[in-house]
Amino acid sequence: MSKRTEQLGHEIQRILGEVIQYELKDPRVGFATVVGVEVTADLQIARVRISVMGTPDERRETMAALERARGFLRRRLAEELNYLRFVPELRLILDTSVDYSLHIDELLRRAAEERADSPPQQPEDDKPAE
């Protein structure tokens, strides 16, 4: 990724985050956060990773509402990024990495609890000879 596409990705992330949080009035949009944007080298496509808190149904509903608002989001980007000739097409992607990390944390917590609850076992080699 070139420095230009990386900078543009950060700028798109900032703008979309603010627009989704403060300007989008759709009540179906739950707690959504733009966690990253990858812009193609030709600046035609921006893959926008979005994390949504809530149940699977709430996530689907939020992503569907954001898909319907894609035109509005792109129009707001065009207003903010007026130095670009073309505004990238937005591809909205549900990011589940936060869920995965929470799942891993839970597994590690359980393993630590199980280890604390079970008595330490003596290795076979350390047992006294009879």
UniProtKB/Swiss-Prot annotation:
It comes from Roseiflexus sp. (strain RS-1). Coiled coil: none annotated. One of several proteins that assist in the late maturation steps of the functional core of the 30S ribosomal subunit. Associates with free 30S ribosomal subunits (but not with 30S subunits that are part of 70S ribosomes or polysomes). Required for efficient processing of 16S rRNA. May interact with the 5'-terminal helix region of 16S rRNA. The keyword Cytoplasm applies. GO terms for cellular component: cytosol. The gene is rbfA. The keyword Cell membrane does not apply. This is Ribosome-binding factor A. The lineage of its organism: Bacteria, Bacillati, Chloroflexota, Chloroflexia, Chloroflexales. It is found in: Cytoplasm.
